[in-house]
A protein has these predicted regions:
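N-terminal capping/small domains of soluble enzymes
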Residues: 169-265, 270-272
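Catalytic cores of alpha/beta
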Residues: 125-128, 197-202, 276-286, 338-351, ...
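Alpha/beta catalytic cores of nucleotide-metabolism and tRNA/nucleoside-modifying enzymes
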Residues: 141, 163-170, 384-411, 421-482
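Glycine-rich phosphate-binding active-site loops on the catalytic face of alpha/beta enzymes
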Residues: 93, 213-218, 296-298, 355-365, ...
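C-terminal helical cap(s) of enzyme catalytic domains, especially alpha/beta-barrels
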Residues: 146-155, 223-233, 367-380, 443-467
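FNR/FR-type flavoprotein reductase catalytic core
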Residues: 1-115
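Glycine/Thr-rich beta-alpha phosphate-binding loop at enzyme active sites
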Residues: 61-64, 236-237, 244, 298-314, ...
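Local cysteine-cluster metal-coordination motifs and their immediate loop/turn environment
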Residues: 20-25, 94-95, 116-145
């Protein structure tokens, strides 16, 4: 910004959202009443009273301040020409900047925009913040952030702006998975929630869509010896080792209490060999549990567990064997450690799985550097938490993408698991194609996480006009075959 513009009475400054603050700072260097200021917010006016503008025009999405609407409700090319502006300076969301560029071009007025782009290094080395211009790629951190709008190339808008649901309408969060009804898609993940009783003093567990039991094996297990947990960057490494009282004890004691809850119960069944899986399934088949989650993916046990989920033949064998002895809806829990997760998923579907849940924890190791040895007695353990979310999301996306290539009658529902911390994460998994989600590690740091996800999901669906989960499910699948 040159000095000769400092006292110009023909300056228009436009800010949107958090972009108001930078241009407000710029405005403070100009003479009072030498500029007009347009501020666009979702709600409120956020300190604009301190501006010394000739005219202050505010727009708000909710109508709480100024003009009800977005920036186009207050300014267009005709407005710029009529006001006699010679220079326009803008900072805000990319769609707003694209609009400002457009109207300034129509009005034949010089425009400078402050671009924002995600960056890593901030010194021009990583090239993560480059934007497209008529002069080639430019780095926002070093070549900007201020650019002549004439050279900026904005991407064409993607997607459709959706209308919110009517005020009296509430979105339907219910979902049906393999014939089993869930009041909402948020399920407590196996291994993190006990049998549904431990958290009852912290929040109303009946509000959950479902609860998945601890991993049950045919025989009782004491779990792994020694240290079982290590907190690491982005999550936890755990080596619990499927400690559980055994399937029969579960049927006699824990399951009746689970079934009293006003939420859908799922029995997670693990095993050490094919026979134990089959016998465990036979026992569960005689109960009232609505669904079985077949765990072929536990990474921190020496016998069975993940060994059945790493390749197609082994996975198909155990699913087929269990399928023969139970009529219960069978959801197979997959491992992220399989070299070909999609291949294993399709093999499970072909073998009789009614659904898939993915992913379990990522196999990891922690080292005790003081004693120069592995932290865990079992050496390898399971890494869980927010750091694995992008990996889990990719695998869910890939599996759903492959599922969509099957005839409709052969497709099965998918439950997304892995690093889900908030409702935004849940939306990502559902848009990737998941029918429901399971939440685990996040509950340790915030017991109310799942309730917050349910509430946030409902609010998002209402705001974006999704009346049902099915309307939102899979919308991010770009190669979807209907």
């Amino acid at each position: 910004y040159s000095e000769k513009n400092k006292a110009s009475p023909n300056v228009c400054i436009i800010g949107g959202g958090i972009g108001v603050a930078p241009v407000a700072c710029f405005a403070s260097t100009l003479l009072p009443n030498s500029y007009d200021f347009y501020a666009s917010f979702k709600s409120g006016s956020y300190g604009t009273k301190y501006l010394r503008a000739n005219k202050l025009i505010i727009t708000t999405d909710d109508g709480s301040e100024g003009i009800h609407g977005m920036l186009p409700a207050a300014i267009n090319a005709e407005t710029i020409q009529r006001a006699g502006y010679k220079y326009v300076y803008a900072c805000g969301p990319t769609p707003m900047l694209a609009y400002v560029q457009k109207i300034c071009k129509e009005a034949n007025v010089k425009c400078f925009i402050s671009m924002e782009n995600r960056m890593a290094c901030g010194v021009g080395a990583c090239l993560g913040c480059t934007i497209r211009t008529t002069e080639g790629n430019k780095r926002v951190c070093k070549d900007g952030p201020i650019f002549d709008s004439d050279i900026i190339i904005f991407d064409e808008p993607s997607g459709v702006r959706r209308q919110s649901l009517a005020a009296e309408m509430q979105p339907d969060l219910s979902v049906e998975i393999a014939g089993v009804k869930f009041n909402n898609p948020v399920i407590a993940a196996s291994g993190t929630f006990g049998f549904g009783q431990n958290y009852r003093g912290l929040f109303d567990v009946n509000k959950l869509g479902g609860i998945c039991s601890k991993g049950m094996t045919l025989e009782p297990r004491a779990g792994n010896p020694g240290q079982r947990l290590v907190e690491v960057t982005g999550g936890l490494v755990n080596s619990i080792g499927l400690e559980n009282p055994g399937v029969q004890h579960f049927i006699d004691n824990e399951l009746p209490e689970m079934l009293k809850l006003k939420t859908t119960s799922i029995a997670n069944l693990a095993g050490s060999d094919l026979e134990s899986y089959v016998k465990g399934a036979e026992l569960l088949d005689k109960t009232d549990v609505p669904m079985i989650e077949l765990n072929i993916s536990c990474p921190n046990v020496k016998a069975g567990g993940m060994a059945f989920g790493l390749e197609c033949t082994a996975a198909s064998t155990v699913v087929s064997a269990v399928r023969k002895v139970t009529k219960k809806p069978l959801v197979v829990k997959l491992s992220p450690n399989a070299p070909d997760v999609v291949g294993v998923a399709m093999a499970c579907v072909k073998a009789g799985a009614d659904g898939l849940s993915l992913v379990n924890t990522v196999q990891a190791i922690a080292i005790d550097i003081e004693n120069a040895k592995p932290v865990f007695a079992n050496i390898r353990a399971g890494y869980c938490g927010p750091a694995i979310k992008p990996l889990a999301l990719r695998m869910v996306y890939d599996v759903v993408e492959a599922m969509n290539r099957l005839p409709k009658e052969e497709r099965v529902p998918v439950i997304g698991i892995g690093g889900i911390q908030n409702w935004q994460d849940a939306v990502e998994f559902i848009m990737a194609g998941a029918n429901a989600i399971e939440v685990g590690t996040a509950t340790f740091s915030n017991p109310n996480t799942m309730i917050e996800i349910i509430d946030g999901l409902a609010a998002f669906m209402k705001r974006k006009g999704y009346a049902t989960l099915e309307q939102m499910r899979g919308v991010a699948q770009v190669n979807c075959t209907q």
